[in-house]
Amino acid sequence: MRDVVLVTADSVRRDFVDAMPFVAGHEVLTGVTAGNYTRPSLAALQSGRLRAAVESRAIGPTLAEVLGDAGYATIGLVPTAQADPAFGFDAGFDRYDNYMSGGGNPAKNRRSRFREFLGSFDLVRQVYRRVYPMEANMADLPEDAAVIDEAIERFDEADPPRFLWVHLMGSHRPYGTGEDAIPGALDRKAEASGGRHWFGASEVTAEERETILAAYRDALGRVDDEVRRLLRELDGDPAFAFAADHGDEFGEEGYYYHQGYRRRVADPVIRVPVVLDGIDAVGECCSLLDLAPTLAGSQGVETPEPWQGTDLREDTTDETVTVAPWRETATVAWQDFERKLVARDADVSMTEGGETVGVERADVPAEVEAQLRDLGYSDAG
């Protein structure tokens, strides 16, 4: 069995992949995410099931569990609170790190429902962001280069076959640190677009939009460099997959970035680039649900019956579903890449194998919720 390397990057839009020349140098598929922000999207990717997006948590058997049972050494380096072990993301990994302290302990420090209530108000969110700017919070995460360094070291130390999952955060707003980042005032202004802004004008000018886009493209270029370096310096010749958890909006419908609580399913948010190198895929479009069965199947590993994705070596995906959950309601989008049907802010449940599950509030440790707020979320959703 061949080594498998999966790289996911935050906030990469399909129509901006030209800013990533290494990634764009491969055959790039148009992928549709199963969730609208990091946690439900990556949960569904790793679980191969739409239910994981509905519940916003990884559900076994995950890709790491399946490959681990087949004899793979499994390594996950995912520097975001959205992939905390409290949400099941560590399942199946021999080595897993999301670089957050105090996470993964659901018995400690349950969050305050009152604080959660306050976090739903634009005024509270904007005050919080003025005190704790996004750039400062992103600077607390390890740089992509450091994550790639560790990934190379961990991968080379492990016995083959090896499965490595790396998530890169350098493409998350404000698209850098220091002079690379969007200025704090502009970042806050863009975040408030589409809603009520309590501290001055909230309309982003054309010039300001170009500033944001330039920073975004530069960030994508830096991420691309790290993806190239990872594959160049790793021991061996792995099968390689690349995808993004979601995209970002840049004012096309008045909104900027990805903001889970808005339950947005616009194409800039849910259409992402997908690369499968060393795996012959049919078709030009896919769902991120397809990655787990395609990666496992390409190595001769039997895919579990609960997985709903398509093995892209054998068939095409012609329809996709995206669930945008937040608290007890969700927006759901169905599309066939030509038409799109959206049900907004609905009570959503899913029946699978005789069991019905619905969209619910996440109940997580206070430390994890604080880390999520630092990434721009009002609460854990």
Located regions from the model:
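Catalytic domains that recognize anionic headgroups
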Residues: M1-G381
